[in-house]
Amino acid sequence: MPTRWRATAAVLVCALHLALFVPTIGDWSSILVNDFAPQAKAIKDGELPYRDQRIEYPPLSVPVLIAPAYFDDSTQGFVDGFMWEMLAFDLAIIVLIALALPGEGGRVLSALGVYTVGLVTLSGVVLDRSLIDYGPLALDRFDLVPTLFVLGAVLARDRERSATWSGLLSLGVAIKAFPLFLYPALLRGERNLRRVIVAGAIPLLACAAAVIVMGDEFGSAITYHTERTLQVESLGASVFEVAHVLGASGVSTGVGHGGFEISASGATAAGWLSVVVGAAGYFWLVWAGWRSKATNFELVAALLAVLVVFAPVLSPQFLLWLLPVSACAYGLGRQNIVLLLAILFTQIELQHYDGVDALSGSFVWPLAVRNVLLLGYLALVAAPIVRDGRKTASPSDRGHRRPPNLSRGGVATAPR
């Protein structure tokens, strides 16, 4: 696809996003008003992020969170600034897909289309708004920031830029930890491990040094996540919620760790089961992926899917991790049809969030459908990788275990 057409596509899609999202700038958001704005103002005024404000995210998230407060530290000013900041990252993702995704025009346009439809649907810009936030979900959270770095890392890996992809992925880890679990996918076939290690270590060591120099400590963020129990929107919780709607007793919700959690006999065991199954699925996909001919985008999408689907905490914004990667991997394929349906039912569930206290059917059923769709999506993206891995690992193919080298278009080629 000629560069001028790529640039034209980027401009047009950016204009569409601006037209849809700019009118929402400043809309009320519970997390921005009640959490991020007070935390940002306190840190700007000298308090420590972890010791004093109990920030739950890695160190490089702090500049992202507090930057708007330096322009206007009023609550409304912070909300406006934060949403503009996230809109800038949204536009950066569009530009990156339009200009850097290899392939013909159809691949680029379909990726941009899937990303746009998914983002608009999940953000409630066209559909009814969420009952949690009036503002768009994509602009009320900062998940687009690490997602941009993940997207850049995969594109750099396709171009065999060892230091670049590792550095970008490490920056994502330093903002929100989930990109750490994508290293195995991008290490497949990598020949310059020294550059990967050095480039990946620099952002993390810089963050650690900054925390130490400030006299702060990061342990509270780790403790926060290890103490979280089964969240109402997780796959494991859906079993209890559906049972409650069908008449089972002893199932309720409670507020804890920034959200609603399931209280029921067996909920703790279900949470641990989700972790165990998710870990097993993750390592299985890594093993199969190293033996398969899946592209980097496909393997990263599969690993993200297993992380999201089996997480004991499955917040709606986690789907933003998947969306642009899956859009680039599968375009208008059935995988993304299922993912977009899952996003649609996520938004429907958010429109009925007033049913979370009583676990009413209007909340539980859309959520259950969403989780089934996410399971279906995981099956669609993981099954080809597992099948391919098994074939390559068969006795007749044991001489061909070397992972494929991926060309710039993400197509397996012979090692050079």
What are these regions (language model features)?
Residues 1-224, 270-416:
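Multi-pass membrane glycosyltransferase architecture that uses lipid-linked
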Residues 38-51, 222-274, 373:
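Luminal/periplasmic active-site loops of membrane-embedded glycosylation enzymes
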